[in-house]
């Protein structure tokens, strides 16, 4: 039962260092394998309209990073798969669970993407289980990621249905207001929820939401994530699709949630909000900094590779120096 687990979030945890065994942090290997492919980092930009478009997806794939294209340009998905495959790049797309998506999946048989993410807010649902089974029947070689979920029961059910990985996180994101609108979610205890789910998982888990610092990537690995989905840290770059807005001479980029009125174009079942983020530099600079910080984390863990982070000790530090949403 959950009540037997300590409840904590990212800011409540500090990892405890081990003796360093590498001469330089540059020796630490940050690569991870998901399915049949290996990627430079265990992170994936959130599949949201203000985080990536086709050009950003292509840049990530060319650079050796994992990506998941969002599902909000439905007609563009098949041309996108062609565009990627024509360049020898992996195709990774998202689908929903509406009836017409079943026909869409059938259309992919001639040119199947390597990865499909079934992307709905409450992924522990019969509709998701049915879609997993459908994709596995029609496209047996495609790696299926399903989510989002927040309990071990959900992880087990989706894995048993055929999901190759599950995405854990209900509403902990910076522009997600599910917890406020519904009273449900993993906001405020996302890291404990990840740990709880990972103990039940037999397949990879993607931690999704609540990442505020690069150190949170190492903490996610420690508590069972194979890959970490990140929104706000990847938003606001020069290449990001969000609109650039000037306020008092300063440049900002918009960032909004996938169930916000800005994304939906209508105020109905809204569980996301819009914020403005100070415009950042290039996406590659952030990826490089994440890699260097993760290499440092691996060296503090006394390790040589990402998996070595899974074995470090930790302490729970309540009332820590940050508070979840405070600006760091």
Curated annotation (Swiss-Prot):
One of its GO terms (molecular function) is GMP reductase activity. The active site is at residue 176. GO terms for biological process: purine nucleotide metabolic process. It comes from the Bacteria. Keywords: NADP, Oxidoreductase. It is an enzyme of class 1 (oxidoreductase). Its EC number is 1.7.1.7. NADP(+) binds at residues 205-228. NCBIfam families: GMP_reduct_2, PRK05458.1. This is GMP reductase. It comes from Streptococcus pneumoniae (strain ATCC 700669 / Spain 23F-1). The keyword Hydrolase does not apply. SUPFAM superfamilies: Inosine monophosphate dehydrogenase (IMPDH) (SSF51412).
């Amino acid at each position: 039962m959950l009540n037997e687990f300590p409840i904590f979030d990212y800011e409540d945890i500090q990892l405890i260092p081990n003796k360093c065994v590498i001469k330089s942090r540059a020796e630490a290997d940050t690569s991870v394998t998901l399915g049949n492919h290996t990627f430079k980092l265990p992170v994936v930009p959130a599949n949201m309209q203000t985080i990536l478009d086709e050009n950003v997806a292509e840049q990530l794939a060319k650079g050796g990073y994992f990506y998941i294209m969002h599902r909000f340009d439905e007609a563009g998905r098949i041309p996108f798969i062609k565009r990627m495959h024509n360049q020898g790049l992996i195709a990774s797309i998202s689908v929903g669970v509406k009836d017409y998506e079943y026909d869409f999946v059938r259309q992919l048989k001639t040119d199947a993407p390597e990865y499909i993410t079934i992307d709905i807010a409450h992924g522990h649902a019969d509709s998701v289980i049915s879609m997993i089974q459908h994709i596995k029947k029609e496209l047996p070689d495609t790696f299926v990621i399903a989510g989002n979920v927040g309990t071990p029961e959900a992880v087990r059910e989706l894995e048993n249905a055929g999901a190759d990985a599950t995405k854990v996180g209900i509403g902990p994101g910076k522009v997600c207001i599910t917890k406020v609108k519904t009273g449900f979610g993993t906001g405020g205890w996302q890291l404990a929820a990840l740990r709880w789910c990972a103990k039940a998982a037999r397949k990879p888990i993607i931690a999704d939401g609540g990442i505020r610092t690069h150190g949170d990537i190492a903490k996610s690995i420690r508590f069972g994530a194979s890959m970490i989905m990140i929104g706000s840290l990847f938003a606001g770059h020069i290449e990001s699709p969000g609109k650039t807005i000037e306020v008092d001479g300063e440049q900002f980029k918009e960032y909004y949630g996938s169930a916000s009125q800005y994304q939906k174009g209508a105020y109905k079942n809204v569980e996301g909000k819009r914020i403005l983020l100070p415009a950042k530099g290039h996406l590659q600079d952030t990826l490089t900094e994440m890699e260097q910080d993760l290499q440092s984390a691996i060296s503090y863990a006394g390790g040589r590779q990402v998996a070595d982070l899974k074995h470090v000790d930790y302490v729970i530090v309540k009332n820590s120096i940050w508070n979840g949403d405070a600006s760091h």
